[in-house]
Each structure stands twice: as C-alpha cells, then as structure tokens.
C-alpha cells in the first residue's frame, strides 16, 4: 500500500481537472453502483444507510462531494461532514456544495481524525477504505460513532470467496491490488474482519454487480489506463457490495 502523501498527490493529479469529462456526467466516483444517475444513486444510498433526516453524518473519503450533495438535497435538516486527504478534490467539492448550509468538508485522514469520541450518528465509506489498513480504519470509525450509531461500507469485493478463484483470476486480483494500490476482499473476509474487531452488529449486507459505464469510460480515456495498466484481459472478477452495521 502507498502512504498518505502518495495517495494525496495521486488524487490531486489524476482525479481533479483530468476527470472533467467524467464530472460532467456524474459527481459520484464509483466503479460499481446500481444507478448511473446521481439523483437515483443518492436515493438508493440514503435507503441503504437508513438515514432518518436529523443525524450528524460523516463521509470518509468524500471525493468531490457528489454523494454529500445528493444526500444533503434529500435531507436538508441533516448535518453532513466530509473528509478527504486531497485538497485538490476538496476545492472542487466547495463548488459542488456551495449552496448547502448543512455540508462542511475538511482535509483529514480517516485513519486518524480530529473528532471526539462518540461524535456521529452515521459514518460511511463509498469505495474509499481500501487505501489503508482495514483494522485501523474500522477502529477509528467505531471510536467516533455514537453508541447505537451506524457504519455503512460500500465497497468493491470479489464476486466469490477468494479461495474459489482460479489461478488466473487470483493473479488478476493481485495485479489489480498492486496496480491500483487498493485492498480488495471477499464478502466473507470483510464480515470476519469486522467480527474480530468487535463492537459492531451487522444489520444487513447486499451485493450488486453493475459496473459504472461512466467510470469505465473515464479509465479508458484518461491517463488512468496507462498508469494502472488497465486492460480487459487482466480485470479480476469484481462486484459491488455494501454492509450496514450498528455500534453496540
């Protein structure tokens, strides 16, 4: 895995102005999502997170604010916070969220935030936690969650248990993890890791297979294809999955 400075520089270089053509189509930067339309995706995420409308909520790895914009539109009385280590992306987020008084962002690592214990009703990740040690990220999220608060994880996972992958599929998975410097697990492994950490109760787990066409086109048409050696022939069997937990 790369260090924080590398990830910050990487996002500032490749995920700001160079993805403008993608931003014109979607502000929600995910490889897997049920809906390409941001409004529909926002409504789906709100339902998956079980947002009531009066909570204090944190997005860890908020990108350019696309998810926050949709959720803040749906829930104007909810207090939304977003953190990101990329100052370049947060500059874009300022414009995306300029009309929302219930949204604020700051430059922070989700592995070591400056929030007090028991601060948030909901903490969520949308394809962002794979850049860091899973256990460290989870422990920090649990720390800043209120008692009975909810943790939502929306992530890239393998389509089946890792031990059921063929040698070629496993080789492609390892290549993906190395070239994108992003940890990917199967659903069972994520659930087992969370159980081992403790302090959370699984409410629900879902899976979805639809890749984002906008995201795939962005990878094909930008420098991301070259720097990650992205080819159809070495794509591992991946899908999207989400997990909703309650702090106990």
Regions flagged by a language model, labelled:
Residues 1-27:
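N-terminal, positively charged/glycine-rich alpha-helical extensions of SAM-dependent methyltransferases
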Residues 35-53:
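Conserved alpha-helix/loop element of class I SAM-dependent methyltransferases that forms part
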Residues 54-63, 152-174:
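Conserved class I S-adenosyl-L-methionine
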Residues 64-112:
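Class I SAM-dependent methyltransferase SAM/SAH-binding core
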Residues 111-123:
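A short acidic, Gly/Pro-enriched loop at the edge of an enzyme's catalytic core
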Residues 135-150:
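A short glycine-rich, Lys/Arg-flanked "PGG" loop and its adjoining helix->strand segment in the class I
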Residues 173-189:
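Acceptor-substrate binding/catalytic loop of class I
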